[in-house]
Every structure is written in structure tokens, then in C-alpha cells.
Curated annotation (Swiss-Prot):
UniProt-annotated catalytic positions: 149 (proton donor/acceptor), 409 (nucleophile)
Protein name: Neuraminidase
Gene name linked to the record: NA
Topology of the protein relative to the lipid bilayer: Single-pass type II membrane protein
Domain of life: Viruses
Length: 466
């Protein structure tokens, strides 16, 4: 059934026993599309009508001049969100830099928080910049030891995109050392994971209410994707994994509705190790994810999740452009698409976002410029085809971060314009102070806009020695 909005305006006019009811209906059409060819499918709905009974004015004996008038507006609930066609454009350009530690000499409530694992998620009215903080600011006496991934102080925080994540600006959503968030069109869903490594717990918050939990199933650092979950028609899909960082770690997907888990999805296929997926809608039927294998290969595990059947399958990307770090030379892995190759130990979360067009689909990816270090970040694109079977190289589309600058985790998200969605990729640029000083990040954002070539890279402008 297509979503529709019915507004009912009830007008009560009481005068000498006269009651009038007026029903007004309005319908909205939503944009739907198939896996490859996206089409408009308008529909109309008509509200039930009621005849109006007229009063014989000649029989009225008196008029009550003190008659009361009451008007009640029954406004519609916000609609669930659905993926739409992408806004027009053929290249990404530098959109925004959030570099909190350029303001590192500021103290008090305006001090920048120590953060890592930033990502962006968008609702119909705003985008929010999320991150995991160590509950410390810079400058300050508590920033030593902030290189550690998991502790009892870490929290999922957010600010409106464009704001600096300072003590004053940030909303603290929940205790968490791994996180995600997404907006279903009506409300935010927040995901936080914390607890001991052997028995971590996923916590779900819907709006302001804490609504559900999910326990560790492999008892080895249950964790989530560190980027936005994905919602369609009120259902939100979240990737989780549990298992060794250097061995087996099998992922699952949780289907969440209004903050409560309604289904678990167990992917088939190549499931040995899948973590830190970056996911988005290829269509209104399919979620696709480019993930990290930290144990066996420098190829990215690629997930296809059918939201109509709630089934998922994982295979390795077949392209000769290997997207993980560290990685071997492009094209050096021989054998079938499922061959792991070498240099598979270790990895990094990768950026991935869809460009949905009426006649084709673009898949945009990011990877570090260095094959061995988390330095630099380049953008790549492939139009149409199947990531599971296409062995061709991806097309380079520009340098977002030079090899002289840090390029750590990256992620994808989409900004909701009035009639279309704007695909974007974000890059975590980490200030790595080691164990003896603060360890935090800036965020660079590139979005689809206009044509031509990607023109300029991003620098953090931060000198940790200052």
C-alpha cells in the first residue's frame, strides 16, 4: 500500500442546535522505483463523505448569541521515509570540514570534545553529526588514554551537522563505545553498544525513550557499523557483528521498528568475517553494504539485503581495485572472485554511497591513498554492473585527502532535498597522539554536486605540537 496523508478538518459550529461537519482530504504521492528503472507511481485516495443536514431556518424560534465555536485540527503524523532518486550531478565536491581542534585553546563549555568514529545521519528536516566521545575535552586533564577503543566513559553524542562538537553543543545520547543512528521519517533511532568484551550489549533508544536491547551471541566484542542504519517505510535495518578481530566474525542484521527489534536476519554466502559495514539503498527493494574483513582479505565483503523478503547474502567484491587497507597491488589477486589473496590481516571502514538515477545506478567508494597506512583518501565510482561479478577496475574520481594527511574511517550518507536525495561521503581525519596525549578526529565531507572534476582536497589545519 502506498503511504498517504489524510488531513481531516473538523469544524464544529453550534448555533441553535446546528452542527456542521466538513471533511477535507488531501493525498500525497510518493516516489517509488524498481531495482534498476525508477518510476513515479502516483495514486489518489478519497476520504469517506457525509451528507450535510440542513436546518429549516423558518422553524428556528431564537438565536443563541452566546453560541460557542470550537475548531479542532487533526494534523497528520509525519510520513515514513523512502529512498528517492538522487539529485542531479556527476561529480563530488568538497562540502564541509568539521575540525574541532582548531579551537583547542578554548576552554570550558566551548572546548572541543575528544571524539572518534564520526558519521552523519539525516532525517527529513536535518542531518546530525554523530561520534563516540571519551567524555573528555581538549585541552583538559582527562585526554590521556583516549586512543583506547572501549572503556566505561565513552558515549554516543551528536550535534546538528555544521556545528562543532563541543561540550556545549553536544547531545549525549547514551553510553556506548560502538554506535549507529538513523531517522525513519518520524523519529530518531539511536544505537549504542557497551559492556565488557565478553558480554557486550546493544541498546536502542527511540526519540527520548530507551526501548530495547540485544545481547552478545559470540561473546567476543559485539559491535555495530559506526555509520548510519537505513530506514524504509518505518523499518530500520542495522548491521551488527560479534567475533574475533583476527578470525571468524559473523554478522547479522536487526530489523527495528519504532525502537524495537522485530526480526533477526542471518546472511548467507561468504560469512567468515564481516564488520563495520557502510550501507545504503540501491533501490526501494535492496540495501547494499560495503564492509570490512579484518582477518582474511583486502577485498570488501559486499552485502545485498532484500527488504521485501528480509534475506541477505554476502560475497566479496570482484573488482581488481582493492578497497581495504592494508592491501596488495591492484589486480594482483588471481583466481575466482571469492579468492582472498594476501595482506588480508587488518583493515579499515570504507565509504560507500549510491547515486540512484532513472536509467542507471552509480556506486561511489573511498579508499586510502596509501596501501599500508591510514593516509590520504581517494574517491572511485562504478556505474551499473554487479559488484559480486564485475572484475573491472573502478574509475578514480579525485583526491579528497592528500597522502600527507590522515585518512581513517570513511562513511556514506544522503541529505534529503525537497524532491531528491544528495549522496555524500565523509572521512575521519584522526589526530593520532598515541597513548601519551589526546587522540581525536576531524571530519571532511564531500557531496554530489554539479559537473566537472573534484577540485580540492581537505586538510585539518591542526598541529598537535601547539
Amino acid at each position: 500500500m502506498l503511504p498517504s496523508t489524510i488531513q481531516t478538518l473538523t469544524l464544529f459550529l453550534t448555533s441553535g442546535g446546528v452542527l456542521l461537519s466538513l471533511y477535507v482530504s488531501a493525498s500525497l504521492s510518493y516516489l517509488l522505483y524498481s531495482d534498476i528503472l525508477l518510476k513515479f507511481s502516483p495514486t489518489k485516495r478519497t476520504a469517506p463523505t457525509m451528507s450535510l443536514e440542513c436546518v429549516n431556518v423558518s422553524n428556528a424560534q431564537a438565536v443563541n448569541h452566546s453560541a460557542t465555536k470550537e475548531m479542532t485540527f487533526l494534523l497528520p503524523e509525519p510520513e515514513w521515509t523512502y529512498p528517492r532518486l538522487s539529485c542531479q550531478g556527476s561529480t563530488f565536491q568538497k562540502a564541509l570540514l568539521i575540525s574541532p581542534h582548531r579551537f583547542g585553546e578554548t576552554r570550558g563549555n566551548s572546548a572541543p570534545l575528544i571524539i572518534r568514529e564520526p558519521f552523519v545521519a539525516c532525517g527529513p528536516k536535518e542531518c546530525r553529526h554523530f561520534a563516540l566521545t571519551h567524555y573528555a575535552a581538549q585541552p583538559g586533564g582527562y585526554y590521556n588514554g583516549t586512543r583506547k577503543d572501549r572503556n566505561k566513559l565513552r558515549h554516543l553524542i551528536s550535534v546538528k551537522l555544521g556545528k562543532i562538537p563541543t561540550v556545549e553543543n553536544s547531545i549525549f545520547h547514551m553510553a556506548a563505545w560502538s554506535g549507529s543512528a538513523c531517522h525513519d521519517g518520524r523519529e530518531w533511532t539511536y544505537i549504542g553498544v557497551d559492556g565488557p568484551d565478553s558480554d557486550a550489549l546493544i541498546k536502542i533508544k527511540y526519540g527520548e525513550a530507551y526501548t530495547d536491547t540485544y545481547h552478545s551471541y559470540a561473546h567476543n566484542i559485539l559491535r555495530t557499523q559506526e555509520s548510519a542504519c537505513n530506514c524504509i517505510g518505518g523499518d530500520c535495518y542495522l548491521m551488527i557483528t560479534d567475533g574475533s578481530a583476527s578470525g571468524i566474525s559473523k554478522c547479522r542484521f536487526l530489523k527495528i521498528r519504532e525502537g524495537r527489534i522485530i526480526k533477526e536476519i542471518f546472511p548467507a554466502g561468504r560469512v567468515e568475517h564481516t564488520e563495520e559495514c557502510t550501507c545504503g539503498f540501491a533501490s526501494n527493494k535492496t540495501i547494499e553494504c560495503a564492509c570490512r574483513d579484518n582477518s582474511y582479505t583486502a577485498k570488501r565483503p559486499f552485502v545485498k539485503l532484500n527488504v521485501e523478503t528480509d534475506t541477505a547474502e554476502i560475497r566479496l567484491m570482484c573488482t581488481e581495485t582493492y578497497l581495504d587497507t592494508p592491501r596488495p597491488d591492484d589486480g594482483s589477486i588471481t583466481g575466482p572472485c571469492e579468492s582472498n589473496g594476501d595482506k588480508g590481516l587488518g583493515g579499515i571502514k570504507g565509504g560507500f554511497v549510491h547515486q540512484r538515477m532513472a536509467s542507471k545506478i552509480g556506486r561511489w567508494y573511498s579508499r586510502t591513498m596509501s596501501k599500508t597506512e591510514r593516509m590520504g583518501m581517494e574517491l572511485y565510482v562504478k556505474y551499473d554492473g554487479d559488484p559480486w561479478t564485475d572484475s573491472d577496475a573502478l574509475a578514480p574520481s579525485g583526491v579528497m585527502v592528500s597522502i600527507k594527511e590522515p585518512g581513517w574511517y570513511s562513511f556514506g550518507f544522503e541529505i534529503k532535498d525537497k524532491k531528491c536525495d544528495v549522496p555524500c561521503i565523509g572521512i575521519e581525519m584522526v589526530h593520532d597522539g598515541g597513548k601519551e596525549t589526546w587522540h581525536s578526529a576531524a571530519t571532511a565531507i564531500y557531496c554530489l554536486m554539479g559537473s566537472g572534476q573534484l577540485l580540492w582536497d581537505t586538510v585539518t589545519g591542526v598541529d598537535m605540537a601547539l
